[in-house]
């Protein structure tokens, strides 16, 4: 599906080598201050063009088509479009009938009977432009409530930071070309990416996300738990293979006496749960880790088949990220923002008092 969210609905459209990529955000309340400069800055973070990302250079200039008037949201659908300006479709002519390993080529073809071979079409990470735009709009709402979502990279390949989560340096990550959270490892991270690129290969990454200023009560019970929604959103990002919340996998190795977050004087003494209990936020920081596989587009010789079942060897052309997880950190951040904004709006009608307050009733 191309639409995400319950109360705040986000729909993306467009393909890697199509005319444009964009999104529609429906359900945003009227009166939210709309910051176009912030929107553009978020899109600029996701852009390629550096030696650590795809050489494909796009201006990624956002055009807001509707839903905003005199600097504020109107309560109507917000449409944002970003035109593709630098697609090299000829690079993919030799892939028209070929299935690239670890891509969506094989599954898209057998599911739909047709696929856009130019850069992967809809399955391309180019679609994430729309997600980042939507996440930026969601952040404008979250900002009104003091909720701040920050993300960065804490692992590249076999190099993983051993810093404690509270020691991750988000200010450094803002200035880092690869959004590195550990200043001491930035050089190793960069070398790992460049070594992969120089050997016609790629490498995976690990992304850390922290949400501060959280409110109590976001999320629902059972099938719409906040952790379920976050995992759903993040697992829908290109190349993501695993998501952890709080202690994550480590919780399976712990005793309950260590994993439980005790309370004293109205405060939690720890945050092993990652800010979520029973599927509902408890007011502590949300803690998430997202793991990206190596970019499947590599330039080493590979084996595959074509749509006729013929075996063949091929070497890929085109422009691709040596580590998709670097720019993926910006996308992961956007998806968390969209989930939280949606939950924030849903919580406004979670009980009678909330509903009465919305109408000024007691």
UniProtKB/Swiss-Prot annotation:
Cofactor(s) needed by this chain: FMNH2
Domain of life: Bacteria
UniProt-listed PROSITE patterns: CHORISMATE_SYNTHASE_1, CHORISMATE_SYNTHASE_2
Catalytic activities: 5-O-(1-carboxyvinyl)-3-phosphoshikimate = chorismate + phosphate
Cofactor binding notes: Reduced FMN (FMNH(2)).
Binding residues annotated for FMN, in chain numbering: 122-124, 238-239, 278, 293-297, 319
GO molecular function, one term: chorismate synthase activity
Residues reported to bind NADP(+): 46
Alphabetical UniProt keywords: Amino-acid biosynthesis, Aromatic amino acid biosynthesis, FAD, Flavoprotein, FMN, Lyase, NADP
An example Gene Ontology biological process: aromatic amino acid family biosynthetic process
Gene Ontology cellular component annotations, sorted alphabetically: cytosol
Claim: Amino-acid biosynthesis is one of the keywords in the record: yes
EC number(s) reported in the record: 4.2.3.5
Entry-linked InterPro entries: Chorismate_synth, Chorismate_synth_AroC_sf, Chorismate_synthase_CS
Top EC class, one word: lyase
Pathway listed: Metabolic intermediate biosynthesis; chorismate biosynthesis; chorismate from D-erythrose 4-phosphate and phosphoenolpyruvate: step 7/7
Subunit-level organization: Homotetramer.
Purpose of the protein: This reaction introduces a second double bond into the aromatic ring system.
HAMAP family for the chain: Chorismate_synth (MF_00300)
Family of the protein in this entry: Belongs to the chorismate synthase family.
Matching NCBIfam families: aroC, PRK05382.1
Name by which UniProt lists this protein: Chorismate synthase
Source organism (scientific name): Campylobacter jejuni subsp. jejuni serotype O:23/36 (strain 81-176)
